[in-house]
UniProtKB/Swiss-Prot annotation:
InterPro entries: NTF2-like_dom_sf, Rng_hydr_dOase-bsu. The naphthalene dioxygenase (NDO) multicomponent enzyme system is composed of an electron transfer component and a dioxygenase component (iron sulfur protein (ISP)). The electron transfer component is composed of a ferredoxin reductase (NdoR) and a ferredoxin (NdoA), and the dioxygenase component is formed of a heterohexamer (trimer of heterodimers) of three large alpha subunits (NdoB) and three small beta subunits (NdoC). Keywords: Aromatic hydrocarbons catabolism, Dioxygenase, Oxidoreductase, Plasmid. The keyword Membrane does not apply. GO terms for biological process: 3-phenylpropionate catabolic process. PANTHER family: 3-PHENYLPROPIONATE_CINNAMIC ACID DIOXYGENASE SUBUNIT BETA (PTHR41534:SF2), BLR3401 PROTEIN (PTHR41534). Component of the naphthalene dioxygenase (NDO) multicomponent enzyme system which catalyzes the incorporation of both atoms of molecular oxygen into naphthalene to form cis-(1R,2S)-dihydroxy-1,2-dihydronaphthalene. The beta subunit seems to have a structural role in the holoenzyme. This is Naphthalene 1,2-dioxygenase system, small oxygenase component. One of its GO terms (molecular function) is dioxygenase activity.
Amino acid sequence: MMINTQEDKLVSAHDAEEFLRFFNCHDSALQQEATTLLTREAHLLDIQAYRTWLEHCVGSEVQYQVISRELRAASERRYKLNEAMNVYNENFQQLKVRVEHQLDSQNWSNSPKLRFTRFITNVQAAMDVNDEDLLHVRSNVVLHRARRGNQVDVFYAA
């Protein structure tokens, strides 16, 4: 299967390449294993077991990136702007500092305590064709964060 990005004008070359990686390398057992790991990780984060998460789910060589993509109308694309920027770009040590900050009793943002619920969906997994130690995983995440009373924030990620 090929995706023609000229005909399907809304499909970026990156998205087409990512789709084909997972389409051509489907492995149900690998996908189930990735789903289980992501679900366990989400549960640890939901119950705010941050040190356990860091110890059991995060490797010392991690590069944790959260990227925000700018969605613009076609008429605005004539201007050359960065379409993506890092919200987070952290290594293991920076994540460890972030965890300790969250657990600090002086951290005013945790009073009253926040409640989280993560939904992990559309998990896909594929081994890298050039590096047998590299696993590509893609998923969608919906995060609900409940604060005081009825204040709820919802975040979406893919």
